[in-house]
Regions:
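Signal peptide processing junction and immediate N-terminal pro/mature segment
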Residues: 21-30
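Short intrinsically disordered, low-complexity segments
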Residues: 6, 21-22, 353
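Bacterial N-terminal signal peptides
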Residues: 11-21
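Bacterial N-terminal signal peptides that target proteins for export
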Residues: 2-12
Length: 381
């Protein structure tokens, strides 16, 4: 099968005998008592941003490190300031960097969660790791959790190896492993675990022989639970647990989650209301032109392992309106809506960020540009 290059390929989550039981995240501001059932009774709508194509963040030539594409956002709101960490990409001729795109992590801030500006004087907040480290040629897929007085960021590290080097999957697909960095202000970060991965790829017969990346983490009773993207030639979602966020154990006997739609899944975002889990995730769907799109679907679970498709098996978002940055048609652009952030609860609404891409390359670009958008659901309680 021919794999069509897309923004997803460039930037693309515990089990003991008892089921997982949480009372909800205790990191970040605790969400209001909103049930999964209430959320599923309502519909997410796009929130127009103030950048090109109604994006919230769009690649900008003023910031050379992210002038081709931005994506895989992760958002935090402390009641005053919105912060969004994201992947920024620029083209490179360095043969050691897979796909020809250099990927770094940046930060944008906002007062209202709609109008965003790149922070840190327009520079990345986390750049390539030291030579020989697991992230020495790129970074991807950040997920940030506010814990007490600091931020914890798990992210994908790229060391230049591909499927060819590990003997699994398509030869060109890059290896990714998860690292951890800590920050007090969200700008200055310190790599933990001596700059080594905290969750590594598995053996050749595992679900994550090529990639462990693109995660969502919940903290409860001094335990972290991670749903993460696993890849061994097929994208699936796995689980891991940790007492400190550094030392992780892959759960469910290293197997993928069950019951999700499609033959491949990635990009999990998980919410727990005290009784039921809700996951937003990506799988592919065919398009009328014979291509395929990665788009957002939802599922529910009573234990976080076995899932049932929700929303009548329909995507979360309708087709993008004309002129919208998320106009990928399944051929020249594959990402309709991908890698959703966690849900942010604001008054009578829930807001999320997501990535998408255009349906054709714009001037000076080899591939369609990826950008970040917003969607919102009105609770109306």
């Amino acid at each position: 099968m021919t794999i069509i290059p897309s923004f997803h390929h460039f930037i693309y989550v515990f089990l003991f005998v008892m089921p997982i039981v949480f009372n909800g995240p205790v990191s970040d501001a605790a969400p209001p008592s909103v049930t999964v059932t209430e959320i599923l009774q309502r519909t997410f709508k796009r929130v127009p941003g103030d950048k090109s194509g109604d994006a919230a963040i769009y690649p900008d030539q003023r910031h050379l490190w992210c002038n081709h594409s931005v994506g895989t956002p992760t958002v935090d709101f402390d009641g005053k300031t919105w912060r969004m960490w994201f992947v920024g990409m620029s083209m490179t001729d360095n043969p050691e960097i897979p796909y020809g795109f250099a990927a770094r992590l940046g930060l944008a801030t906002s007062n209202d969660g709609i109008h965003w500006n790149i922070a840190n004087e327009g520079q990345p907040i986390l750049d390539f790791g030291s030579p020989g480290k697991f992230d020495d040629v790129g970074l991807s897929h950040p997920f940030v959790l506010r814990v007490d007085d600091h931020y914890m960021m798990w992210y994908g590290g790229i060391d230049g190896r591909t499927g060819k080097d590990v003997g699994v999957g398509p030869a060109h697909v890059r290896v990714e492993q998860i690292g951890l960095a800590i920050s007090r202000d969200g700008v200055t970060w310190h790599r933990e675990n001596n700059g080594n991965p905290v969750l590594s790829i598995g053996p050749q017969d595992s679900i994550d022989a090529v990639q462990v990346t693109g995660c969502h983490v919940i903290r409860k009773d001094n335990r972290f639970v991670m749903w993460y993207g696993a890849y061994n030639g097929t994208h699936t979602i796995g689980l891991a647990t940790s007492s400190d966020g550094v030392h992780w154990h892959k759960e469910n006997e290293g197997r993928s989650l069950r019951g999700l739609m499609g033959g491949k899944q990635l990009g999990p975002s998980v919410y727990f209301d005290g009784n039921q889990y809700l996951m937003f995730y990506n799988t592919t769907r065919p398009t009328p032109n014979g291509g395929s799109q990665w788009t957002l679907y939802s599922a529910t679970s009573s234990d976080g392992i076995k899932w049932q498709p929700a929303n009548h098996n329909k995507p979360l978002l309708d087709e993008a309106p004309e002129g919208n940055f998320g106009s990928a048609d399944g051929q020249t652009g594959n990402n309709h809506a991908v890698h959703p952030t966690k849900m942010i609860f604001i008054e009578d609404a829930i807001r999320m960020g997501y990535g998408a891409e255009e349906n054709k390359p714009s001037k000076g670009r080899r591939y369609p540009a990826g950008a970040i958008g917003l969607m919102e659901l009105r609770i109306g309680r």
